[in-house]
């Protein structure tokens, strides 16, 4: 009987444990190294374009509430501040060939958590 209860408990735990959805992100057009080679104007244009792209994610089915942190955080910053955040983050990255779209998301997410 003890074994049966243990087995039932194990099955319940396994089935109740939330599964995480795997998401594949395409590499995009630029690497972290490409960003460092951009002019200041290009860096500001890139980061604001990246944010604009993330803000239209609901068009592709992303829940709008998932963007609240980005709207709140980026709405308080200038394009210069956003580019500065990304520049610092990219310089600290060990992999210059990292996909810039993912690096940008991570940089913004980290910066916004500290505000």
Where are these regions (language model features)?
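Compact alpha-helical subdomains of small soluble proteins
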Residues: 22-30, 41, 56-115
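Surface-exposed ligand/attachment interfaces on beta-rich extracellular proteins
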Residues: 34-39
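Globin-like tetrapyrrole-binding proteins
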Residues: 50
């Amino acid at each position: 009987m003890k074994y049966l209860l243990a087995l039932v408990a194990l099955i319940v735990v396994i089935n109740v444990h939330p599964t995480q959805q795997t998401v594949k992100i395409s590499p995009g057009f630029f690497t972290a190294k490409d960003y460092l080679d951009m002019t200041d104007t290009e860096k500001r244009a890139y980061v604001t374009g990246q944010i604009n792209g993330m803000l239209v994610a609901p068009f592709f089915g992303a829940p709008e509430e998932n963007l609240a942190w980005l709207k709140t955080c980026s709405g308080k910053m200038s394009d210069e501040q956003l580019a500065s955040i990304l520049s610092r983050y990219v310089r600290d990255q060990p992999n210059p060939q990292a996909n810039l779209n993912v690096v940008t998301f991570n940089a913004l997410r980290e910066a916004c958590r500290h505000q």
